[in-house]
Every structure is written in structure tokens, then in C-alpha cells.
């Protein structure tokens, strides 16, 4: 790794894929070949995790940031984002939007910027109704909050959450009762 003389083996395993496996101890249980159910804590995974060994689990986005932070320094990373939510966030932009796909923006970017400047706006001249963040556990953000800076605290304050970065745009034709 970076000509350090250090190397290691990496095993990639498929888990059960159940929604509950987003919880770290349920994911470990699934990787071990068992039903993906959360484990009681303590012990915490850093002490006794996968196969009863110390384990660090993070999402791919977190691990992808590490090389750039090592190369550029923590101050570089902290120079992006907001006071409480540093760095960038990857979103999977979908729904009623011209430009769907993965995008990475600094924390603090507004929902309006993501939808209209990056996403290209709503097709067919339709009006924006809401955006869902945080997946099934998140919430729907109405038009009155389009200019709120996106970060962990602000999303929670308006009844949603960041989650893993899903961002689904809805237009005037979406029925919020059906969405719920």
C-alpha cells in the first residue's frame, strides 16, 4: 500500500441483503452465514465483531474518503461542508428529475441546487412537490425547504435524515398518501 511494504488479503462476501443488514451487527451475523439479526451490545464490534474478532464496519463512502484525507490532510477535508457536517456527500438522485445518477456535493449544498442545477430540474415543466431522503426510514421534504443547506442536523430538524444518500424527487403528480 503506497510502497509501504504492507499488504493484506481482502475477502468479499455476499450477505443476506435484508434491510436489517444495514445495522452493523446484523450485517456481521449475515456474513457469518446466519440470519441477519442485530446482536446485543456490549460487546461492541471493535472488541468482538465478525467471527468474534475486532471489527471495523463503515460504508463504502467513508472508506473512499480515507485515501484523499491521508493525501491531502484533515484540514483539506474539513474545509468542505458545514460547521457540523464536514466534507462531501454522495447522493443517488432519482425520481422525477432530468439527470438521474450518482453525484457528490459538499455538505451544505441546498436541495434546490441539487435538483435544479445538477439534476436539471423536473421534466415537462411540472412543479416540485417533495424529495425523499434517508430511504424508507427518512422523510419527504416539501418545497418550503428547498433552500435549506443539506447536512445531517438540518435534515433531522425538518423530519428527514441523510441515511445512505438516496434522494428521490417527486413532482405535482405524485400522491403523498400513496408515498406514505
Locate predicted features.
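Short amphipathic, charge-patterned alpha-helical segments
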Residues: 107-123
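Immediate flanking context of iron-sulfur cluster ligation sites
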Residues: 120-129, 173-180
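Ferredoxin-type iron-sulfur electron-transfer modules in oxidoreductases and energy-metabolism complexes
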Residues: 1-4, 144-180
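Short polybasic amphipathic segments
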Residues: 90-93, 129-133, 167
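Short, ordered loop/turn segments at secondary-structure junctions
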Residues: 15-16, 136, 172
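A structural signal for short secondary-structure junctions
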Residues: 84-85, 97, 125, 159-163
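Terminal amphipathic helices with adjacent charged low-complexity linkers/tails
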Residues: 8-10, 123-157
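Hydrophobic alpha-helical positions that pack around
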Residues: 1-107, 119
